[in-house]
Amino acid sequence: MFILGSGSPRRKELLAQIGVVPDDIRPPDINETPLKGELPRPYCARMAREKACAVDALPDDVVLCADTTVALGRRILGKPEDATEAAAFLKLLSGRRHRVITAIAVRVAERVWEKDVVSIVRMKSLSQAEIQSYIDSEDWRGKAGGYGIQGPAAALIPWISGSYTGIVGLPLAETAGLLQAAGYRGAS
């Protein structure tokens, strides 16, 4: 059985692009608070691994989990709690480059295969009106860094370097490779 350990509709849609349909969806419930002094990339990898290990599965089940983190320097910008925090994130990202890290973990029994992908995103300089318009769209909800590149925020991002699907939430080339390494052979 193939289990997607994520409640993200974007991850489910991305998997479908490579012909992978989960048999079940089981979002794990873990503490996502960064450790004191933890840097963004190790944090993101730890989250994906902990999520994969937290999903209840049988020994021959294939479990896929991922975590996406927006990093501005050493600072981790998670999912904003409210519109005020989302606006603050956009203000921080305005006119700057930042990293989007997506870590993936595939687990079968006690074995875990891991990979992370780092992409660079440049957000244009945003006016207060542009920030407010995006906040009003509600598209920031549930998204690391307070924006989703696949929605209205695409108009705010003139340049990326790296994996577009990684920025959305699941780097497909790397995910396909990990699933293959774990012995997953596709939909049955």
From Swiss-Prot:
<feature type="site" description="Important for substrate specificity">
    <location>
        <position position="68"/>
    </location>
</feature>
<dbReference type="GO" id="GO:0036218">
    <property type="term" value="F:dTTP diphosphatase activity"/>
</dbReference>
<dbReference type="InterPro" id="IPR029001">
    <property type="entry name" value="ITPase-like_fam"/>
</dbReference>
<keyword id="KW-0378">Hydrolase</keyword>
<keyword id="KW-0546">Nucleotide metabolism</keyword>
<comment type="similarity">
    <text>Belongs to the Maf family. YhdE subfamily.</text>
</comment>
<dbReference type="Pfam" id="PF02545">
    <property type="entry name" value="Maf"/>
</dbReference>
<dbReference type="GO" id="GO:0036221">
    <property type="term" value="F:UTP diphosphatase activity"/>
</dbReference>
<dbReference type="GO" id="GO:0009117">
    <property type="term" value="P:nucleotide metabolic process"/>
</dbReference>
<dbReference type="GO" id="GO:0005737">
    <property type="term" value="C:cytoplasm"/>
</dbReference>
<feature type="site" description="Important for substrate specificity">
    <location>
        <position position="150"/>
    </location>
</feature>
<feature type="active site" description="Proton acceptor">
    <location>
        <position position="67"/>
    </location>
</feature>
<feature type="site" description="Important for substrate specificity">
    <location>
        <position position="10"/>
    </location>
</feature>
<comment type="function">
    <text>Nucleoside triphosphate pyrophosphatase that hydrolyzes dTTP and UTP. May have a dual role in cell division arrest and in preventing the incorporation of modified nucleotides into cellular nucleic acids.</text>
</comment>
<keyword id="KW-0963">Cytoplasm</keyword>
<protein>
    <recommendedName>
        <fullName>dTTP/UTP pyrophosphatase</fullName>
        <ecNumber>3.6.1.9</ecNumber>
    </recommendedName>
</protein>
<dbReference type="InterPro" id="IPR003697">
    <property type="entry name" value="Maf-like"/>
</dbReference>
